[in-house]
Regions:
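Negatively charged
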Residues: 1-192
Length: 192
């Protein structure tokens, strides 16, 4: 099975974590117009769909989610995702959300309300093709763990992190491990 169309699916108060795990050979997946607003745990939903190159989840209502950990982890062939309209205001766990998405080239998450975010460890780890990442609107006042968040992001140009409030963050270890860009991120407003 290489292509699957599941548009219009209604998931009511369910856990769809790891839902597609047995279908690792999928290259195309239509999950448009899903109703998942009552699903708190979306962790690992698309992991590890390493052959998947096409995915449209832009219309998802994730306002009821508290965990997006590993959601797209290991989707190594996906080059772009439009998640700009997502309401992630209740999400605490973003760990490894895009980890290992080696072909992902750009991502605009600037409109995300990150006030509830606690764990962002390895969120973009291994996104080696990621050049453009807009996180400019983020305020991370409750974030506790950002370890290895940008680890092995070899192509990333200077992300705008100037608005981040990291005074409550207890783990910043290896935040930029493997970061080789010529420009330095702006930490001028950070209070640690």
């Amino acid at each position: 099975l290489q292509s699957l169309r599941l548009s219009g699916l209604v998931v009511s108060q369910g856990n769809i974590s790891g839902m597609f795990e047995p279908l690792s050979g999928l290259t195309s997946l239509d999950v448009s117009n899903w109703t998942i607003s009552d699903s708190p745990n979306l962790s690992g939903t698309f992991a590890p769909l390493s052959s998947l190159s096409s995915l449209n989840a832009s219309s998802w209502d994730v306002s009821g989610a508290t965990s997006l950990g590993g959601l797209f982890s290991g989707c190594a062939k996906i080059e772009s995702l439009d998640l700009s309209g997502w309401d992630v205001s209740r999400v605490c766990d973003f760990s490894s959300m895009f980890a290992g998405d080696a072909a992902l080239a750009s991502l605009d998450l600037s409109s995300w309300d990150m006030e509830s975010a606690r764990d962002l460890s390895s969120m973009f780890s291994g996104c080696e093709s990621l050049e453009s990442l807009d996180l400019s609107g983020w305020a991370l006042s409750k974030a506790e763990n950002t370890s290895a968040m940008f680890s092995a992001c070899e192509s990333l140009t200077s992300p705008n992190l100037s608005a981040w409030r990291v005074s409550g963050t207890t783990n910043l270890s290896e935040l930029f491990q493997g970061y080789v860009a010529s420009s330095t991120p702006d930490f001028s407003n950070w209070v640690i």
